[in-house]
Amino acid sequence: YNKLKNLESNNPVIDITNVTRYREILDYCSSIPDCHAVLSPDSEKGISYTIKAGIMAVQEQKKTGMQDYYMFAVADQPYLKSQSVIKLIDKVLENKGNMKSVFSLRCGDTVGNPCVFHSSLIPQLLSLEGDKGGRSVAKKYDCVYVDIADERELTDIDTLSNSKHTVTL
């Protein structure tokens, strides 16, 4: 959140909505000015629930008219650099007139989060089920990749064992 929030302060086109299944995170976000957060207890059933909760929260905030693109990022990528996210956002803004639909970070053959979708793909994202994420939608389109040099930035640490493995890299 802090990395994205720093980007938001430099770029008025960015608005951040946090989706969490943890009440503690929701409470924490409510103590921060301009931190939009939504509780999604169903997220434990799969990533599709998190995606839907985020989209619906943005739509409920009546921001849909302003949103051309939706970026989905996970909170457990400790090595993700702000510069990489800036490169991704710059690529989206640079391609805005070309109507590209999907943007993602990549290191070699490894593709990862964050991923950005044009608002025209929202119906497809809302139709996702279970643990199917946005990548299943992204694969249907000519994705614009932003190449990064360090694959560790794409590392997603979901468990304590992943964390221990990552530390030894």
Question: Where do the language-model regions lie?
Answer:
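Conserved alpha/beta core of the MobA/IspD/sugar-nucleotide pyrophosphorylase nucleotidyltransferase superfamily
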Residues: 123, 127-169
